[in-house]
Amino acid sequence: MNHLRRNLLLAAASLAFATAAHAKDPKELVIGTSSGPYSDQLKLGIKPILEKQGYKVRIVEFNDYVQPNYALAEGSLDANVFQHIVYLTKFATDNKLPLSSLITVPTMPIGLYGGKQKSLAEVKNGATITMPNDPTNQARALVMLAKMGWIKLKPNVDPLRASERDVLENPKKLKLVPLEAAQLPRSLADADYAFVNGNFALAAGMKLTSALSVEKISDSYINLVAIRTADKAKPWVKDLEAAYRSRAFLDATNKYLAGYEKTDYQLALEKTLKK
């Protein structure tokens, strides 16, 4: 509890300082994010682009998924980057916050990594596969297994809510072992395969590109930039969106964010550049 309180106090102090500076300088943008990969995405990809346009960019990191939206709604932040549309919509509706999505961002997929087995072709009857135990990410893992043909899910199951109860056929008698997401990288020492979320894979020193299979992320799970709805037409919002759509950010994505799933606008830009 003391650790959580200390983190919240530090975040509040950072926000107070950022807000004071922001009040003096309208060209300063304060962007909130979760610590780790999405903070790095801002620091390496977006901040340099905006600074070349004369903006000062301050990045505030949070250790929870609640404060960033409250801080945005209250005006301490100009934008935040940490959530997908399902979470934003529910949180904003439940708490009556006037927040909107601006643009999607490159997102880390969940991947199937090899433990005792180093290729998908080596899968054996009775293989042990560890997977996240939270409903959202477990559904993602089960849908991947179904698409790979290793299991069959019940007809018409909602892919966003699939659970072990929805496994209709398991011809290889795979042993599906749900674990806390943070434990999944360590489980590779004992399991044949493990589903690992991108942020935990990177934290464990794994490369996203080492995954044997990677999900095609549903639009529902692609992370985004959130802003206050009232700010949609402001010039800085247009500049922020343009930074994400830029060639410079695409180059940064290719250089620093290997393994992230690119956005539709980045894929379209790549296609244009190849012509």
Segments from the language model and where they lie:
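Extracytoplasmic "Venus flytrap"
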Residues: E28-I46, N63-Q67
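Short helix-initiation/N-cap motifs at beta->coil->alpha
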Residues: I59-Y70, V157-R186
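Pocket-flanking alpha-helical
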Residues: Y65-K96, G111-L112, K118, A201-G205
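Alpha-to-beta junction loops
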Residues: A73-Q83, A127, W150, K172-L174, ...
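Ligand-binding "clamshell"
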Residues: K90-L102, Q117, D190, F195, ...
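A conserved helix-loop-strand patch within extracytoplasmic ligand-binding domains
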Residues: L102-K152, L250
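A bilobed periplasmic-binding-protein/Venus flytrap-type ligand-binding module shared by bacterial periplasmic
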Residues: P109-L120, I222-W236
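Periplasmic-binding protein-like
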Residues: A139-A146, Y244-D264
